[in-house]
Amino acid sequence: METWWKDAVIYQIYPRSFKDTTGNGIGDLKGIISKIDYIADLGVDAIWLSPIFTSPMQDMGYDVSNHRDIDPIFGNLKIFDQLIKKSHKNNIKVIIDQVLSHTSDQHPFFILSRSNKTNPKKDWYVWADAKSDGSPPNNWLSIFGGSAWEWDTSRKQYYLHNFLKSQPDLNFHNKMVQKWVLSIIKFWLEKGVDGFRLDTANYFFHDKKLRNNPALSNKKINSNPYYQQELKYSINQKENLIFMKALRKVTNRYKDIVMIGEIADPKVQAEYTSDNNKLHMAYSFELLKENFSNTLIQNTVLDFFKNSKNGWPCWSFSNHDVPRHVSRWSNSKIHEHNFAKLTCAILLSLKGTPCLYQGEELGQTQTEIEYDEIKDPPGKKFWPIDFGRDGCRTPMVWNKKEKNAGFSNCAPWLPIKKQQLKNAVEPQTCLLYTSPSPRDLST
């Protein structure tokens, strides 16, 4: 059973949008529990939950202010225990997102760290003095736009944030930070989880010398300047691999645990999954790209196993960060429903572990979000060039005849639109009823 994950089908749940039981328009843990039978009927082996921890929700839970508790909008630790119990009773393993490279700026540690330069958490985050002209320490950029450095008036220093300014990066060069992060992993293992999906797994360490990132040789202008730098010094540091080994040692003390790392660069994936002493799997971005072709899929799979001697990939066509693939890869010559079945069959036939995103089993399409409906920070910043991620995060369509499609008895946090009602669990429009189950296809 130690490699159960190699034969598994994983089902990703975005809790905010799965099922609301409290009447606030936001999905919750009880909602997931209420649908475990549905998930079991799909034939999947594990669920992966996007962040459910205490958070101000500036980035929908990826800004964590307490890594050891459940945000009240989702429930509490007691309800989480119930979710683990019911999932395991149905032979479904539970994998949870872990956001470890940074915290929320509302985390007690950061509040203390920014207060002065002498406090106990003074170097738990990445602080640096301004240049002589007052500008940031280097040219590093945030993936969400602008400089990766934010000036703090209390400490009179800049702090690093690879993402939103409300998501300050932890200083992993500090051994106490490493010890604290390992204790978080132990906490959730003791709660009975079966694995972790490590968000931005190659972002933990930064170059101590804070050297400038070089420009990419490709002169093509991107709508987001972040992608015009070679991220040589801001991420992918050698110390990161050493820490992955420390994480693996912790998980190895428990039975049948899997550790999946979110890593965009295929070459880096090979490093992180080699030698059976770091990540168990790399969550690949290569098949989340804009254009669909048999060449893309063939080359991606072949390249992974060519570069990674004994690594193992986790493949997805859709997730909570990219437009749904049925729309992203749309072709007017192919009916959407048929295309959804085709791509599902392809995903489940690839060597590696497939990960289905909620609604993918329905052939769900991307929701068109108007500007005044946008909740996602990058969507607001880069619109209309980039519409953000809300379109793939709209609520699950359970029954097209019920109020709010059976998701909630009040207005949902993101709209459910007519186009998406066509792909509902009830009546039986699910791909589940028109093709073999994911479990059958992957074996």
Model-derived regions: residue spans:
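Active-site and adjacent substrate-binding regions of carbohydrate-active enzymes
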Residues: 1-435, 439
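N-terminal low-complexity segments that are often proline-rich with Ser/Thr-Pro
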Residues: 441-443
